[in-house]
From Swiss-Prot:
The gene is aroC. The keyword Amino-acid biosynthesis applies. FMN binds at R125, S126, S127, N241, A242, G285, K300, P301, T302, S303, S304, R326. Its EC number is 4.2.3.5. Belongs to the chorismate synthase family. This is Chorismate synthase.
Length: 366
């Protein structure tokens, strides 16, 4: 098994490499009758595409999506939807000097150890370029969610860059689209711009923490033990390039709390059960509660930096390497729309699973 697919009923297979002619996604299991046009998916791809500001890689890709199958007269047909994005701005010559060297911090060495061959041009399949296909699939998932959970909204934003965190007291949803970092804190966005400018000019990089919230998701999604909603969300986020950690709700900080502080107390509201807090991140026992679903993931610093580092060649000789090419000083910036896309795919998948198992019937309280 090559493990290029994810999902249960809404199943996404991505394909293509960083410097190949194209990449894309084959989406199987999308319900029929979902209104979809290329422009709807393009909207989400435009938020991720490179070269939009000085804080991301200067590789210039239009990232124009083409729908090749599964859509007729502006609606999905229920058959596989094929999405393709052409690569147009590859500079493979930037990687000629490292074709026999392994870049520290990259997947070069592990791909070679596993397969005995690797595409050294931009990392091939291990490149974050692959995530464009995920965002395209996520755009389709968002449109399908509208029909099944019309109140659902999925929003991602950065909450930490290097050692610098947002001030939750200044959290403003309206600020997220107003700065290049997708930060809900205007002061943090300004401070981070100065911080990243210094790192970028020095040729270094930095990690980040991204938070993705799904609001308006109904209670009841997910299943006990091995079909947990948070299991699939954690796996989806962990599969994103450079991700080294995932948290749901309070996450690791829950270990510092007492039982009294961590348990979200329940009371009856006008529209059913309500909670005094959301330490659980909208999921209990692997099943959604109806509260906001909150997921965070941490991305490591970009490994491609302009500092000379020690490494080895394919023949085992010790040497040094300097990475050329165009790279993100903070991959967390463009990971925001990727995290949103993965959230959308998982939520839709579980909406379909829930509908298939339970239908319209649910436990009613009050």
């Amino acid at each position: 098994m090559s493990m290029n697919s994810f999902g249960h009923l809404f199943r996404v297979t991505t394909w293509g490499e960083s410097h190949g002619p194209a990449l894309g996604a084959t989406v199987d299991g999308c319900p029929p009758g979902v209104p979809i046009e290329e422009a709807m998916i393009q909207h989400w791809l435009d938020r991720r595409k490179p070269g939009q500001n000085k804080y991301t890689t200067q590789r210039r890709e239009a990232d124009e999506v083409k729908i090749l199958s599964g859509v007729f007269e502006g609606q999905t047909t229920g058959t596989p939807v094929q999405l393709m994005i052409e690569n147009t701005d590859q500079r493979s010559k930037d990687y000629g000097d490292i074709k026999d060297k392994f870049r520290p911090g990259h997947a070069d060495i592990t791909y070679f150890q596993k397969y005995g061959i690797r595409d050294y041009r931009g990392g091939g399949r291990s490149s974050a370029r692959e995530t464009a296909a995920r965002v395209a699939a996520g755009g389709l998932a968002r449109e399908a969610i509208r029909a099944l959970a019309p109140n659902a909204q999925i929003t991602g934003y950065m909450v930490q860059m290097g050692p610098h965190r947002i001030d939750r007291a200044r959290f403003d949803w309206a600020q997220i689209e107003q700065n290049p970092f997708w930060v809900p804190d205007a002061q943090a966005a300004s401070d981070w711009a100065d911080y990243l400018d210094g790192l970028r000019k020095s040729g270094s990089s930095v990690g980040a923490v991204i938070e993705v919230v799904a609001r308006g998701v109904p209670a009841g999604l997910g299943a006990p033990v091995y079909g947990k909603l948070d299991t699939d969300l954690a796996a989806a986020m962990m599969s994103i390039n450079a991700v080294k950690g995932v948290e749901i709700g309070e996450g690791m900080a829950a270990a510092e709390l007492t039982g009294e502080a961590n348990a979200d107390e329940i009371f009856m509201g006008q529209n059913g059960p309500q909670y005094s807090s959301n330490h659980a991140g909208g999921i209990l026992g692997g099943i959604s509660t109806g509260q906001d679903i909150v997921v965070r993931f941490a991305v490591k610093p970009t490994s491609s930096i302009l500092t000379t580092r020690k490494t080895i060649t394919k023949s085992g000789e010790e040497t040094e390497i300097i990475t050329k090419g165009r790279h993100d000083p903070c991959v967390g910036i463009r990971a925001v729309p990727v995290g949103e896309a993965m959230m959308a795919c998982v939520i839709l998948d579980h909406l379909l699973l829930h509908r298939g198992q339970i239908g319209a019937n649910r436990g009613h309280i009050g």
